[in-house]
Regions:
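Nucleotide/phosphate-binding sheet-loop regions of phosphoryl- and nucleotidyl-transfer enzymes
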Residues: 1-279, 306, 312-314, 320-327, ...
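Catalytic domains of riboflavin
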Residues: 273-296, 310
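Short, flexible loop segments at the rims of nucleotide/cofactor-binding pockets, characterized by
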Residues: 294, 335-336
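Alpha-helix N-cap recognition
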Residues: 250, 294-304
Length: 347
């Protein structure tokens, strides 16, 4: 089985589509169950593929598939939603997945992200076809994201999250709330030690904070991808200074890494201690970025964009976010979610 991912020259986290478990069919599910010795794992993998392929490639907008349902049931639900067939052959699945990843370059969210980040629409993307490893296999398996330094504060300590018995999209999509990375040290201690060493090596080689996606399969570590991390303004400044002091980069390089707009963001409003003490706290959570957002609460991304265009400050509140919410997130002064961790693409 393989995963099909984007490979743009400039990384756009969460903006382009990914399809996992490509190649699983009724027949290969039986083979996977035999080789793994776990029919529940094989069924879970097939269910994950059907739902993701149906939504990403066929635009089915289906949810709630259950491992207790048959593959025929999943195919029928997708057929009713789209009028299209879920392929039950590896070649058809692969061709469909590759086409969908290419097409996602021109999706609304990808175009909006490039506009916001000043990235040319002419660059295009490659497609990466990569062998699958299975974080959903057993209790010694899982998936996560590791930053070689804290992306919110710039602290020179690894920061990340881990989700047991899961696949990578479960973490970065924000659909599940993972555990702190330290949970991995209990579940797979050898892989945890190896991961921290790999993060140091990659950061030293790239001379930038690394955002690493990884999977653990039966205690064995696999690095899926690494890229230069997106950092909060405070973290960007602290990291540049720290790397210059450590001799990783030159002082001139450190200065050039901080564009003027990031300095302006550092001057954004903060809550003073007296106001914090006097405030009535309605809810609490884990901050993905420092600063203060003020506005009326809206729960729909389109509504957030519409009100923002009228000059109204809004805070977007969602159970969880998806890349389809990007236009609303960009238009909001702050985003609040009920689920998802601080290493998700939305954060």
């Amino acid at each position: 089985l393989v995963s099909v991912r984007s490979g743009a020259a400039i990384s756009m986290p969460g903006m382009m589509d990914t399809v996992l478990n490509v190649g699983i069919t009724d027949q290969t599910e039986l083979v996977l169950a035999t080789e793994s010795g776990d029919t529940a794992f094989a069924r879970d993998t097939h269910r994950r593929f059907a739902q993701l392929y149906g939504n990403v490639v066929l635009k089915a907008n289906v949810d709630g598939f259950d491992n207790g349902q048959s593959a025929d049931h999943w195919r029928e639900e997708i057929r009713k939603a789209t009028g299209s067939e879920l392929p039950n052959d590896a070649t058809g699945q692969l061709l469909g997945a590759v086409g969908a990843v290419f097409e996602s370059w021109n999706s609304r969210r990808a175009k909006r992200y490039r506009q916001h980040q000043g990235i040319s629409d002419l660059l295009g993307t490659a497609v990466t076809v990569q062998a699958m490893v299975f974080g959903n296999l057993d209790a010694r398996s899982g998936t996560g994201v590791l930053f070689s330094r804290n992306p919110s504060t710039g602290d020179a300590e690894p920061f990340g999250e881990y989700l047991r018995r899961a696949q990578g999209e479960d973490v970065v999509s924000g659909s599940f709330t993972p555990e702190p990375l330290s949970a991995m040290s209990d579940a797979a201690p050898a892989a945890y030690t190896e991961l921290l060493a790999a993060a140091r090596t990659l950061e030293h080689a790239e001379k930038e904070v690394q955002d690493i996606e990884f999977t653990v399969e039966r205690g064995e570590l696999f690095l899926l991808q690494t890229r230069s991390a997106k950092l909060a303004p405070q973290a960007e400044v602290r990291t540049a200074i720290a790397m210059a002091r450590e001799g990783l980069i030159a002082i001139r390089t450190a200065i050039c890494r901080i564009p003027p707009d990031r300095i302006r963001q550092l001057m954004a409003p903060r809550i003073c201690a007296d106001a914090r003490a006097a405030a009535v706290q309605l809810a609490g959570g884990e901050g993905a970025c420092p600063g203060v957002g003020i506005g009326i609460v809206v729960t729909d991304a389109d509504e957030a964009e519409r009100l923002s265009d009228q000059g109204v400050a809004v805070v977007l509140a969602r159970r969880t976010t998806s890349p389809h919410d990007l236009h609303g997130m960009i238009s909001s002064t702050a985003v609040v979610t009920e689920e998802g961790g601080s290493t998700s693409h939305a954060a």
